[in-house]
Amino acid sequence: MTDMPRFVGSMVALVTPFRDGEVDFDALGRNIEEQIDQGTMGLVPCGTTGESPTLSHDEHDKVVAFTVEKAAGRVPVIAGTGSNSTEEALRLTRHAQQAGADGCLVVNPYYNKPTQQGLYEHVARLGEVGLPIVLYNIPGRTGIELTPDTVVRCYEDVPAVVAIKEATGKPDVTSAIASSCDITILSGDD
């Protein structure tokens, strides 16, 4: 895991602006510049705040590629690539890697409520791409929670897993993860 980045600091979950039913790339570009000018330490397009479940595949791909291009290496870009479909999450993760993203934010597969083993297998498959993974544990949105044991297992067994965005709002869960492994813990519930 020494070759993988450690994502730290305040990062912004970007909104995906629309105008007349289309992604407003001018507004997105202005937002990216403003966030970088104000000192953000990372950009996260196509996460929950970026309305990833409501974007078409084409829109999703274009927003990620645009964000990477606009950031131009000034700050890391962690592209939201999660899906309740492992194959779709793989496609999104591969695209993010090809576009030049520095990492990917992988929300727990929503609606289907897989077992902890199923969650682990989902993450392990995505890890095969090789793009650094930030797990996203937000059970209030997904209906399923990664347990601390599963987080530790993913971190220890899947070299691409470098961080978790822990959004359960449960200090005991965060403490259990922190005391069990050296994964970077990011916090946020948006």
Q: Where is each model-derived feature located?
A:
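Catalytic alpha/beta core domains of metabolic enzymes, predominantly
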Residues: 128-131, 140-190
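Active-site beta->alpha loop and helix N-cap motifs at the rims of alpha/beta catalytic domains
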Residues: 2-12, 16-143, 153, 161
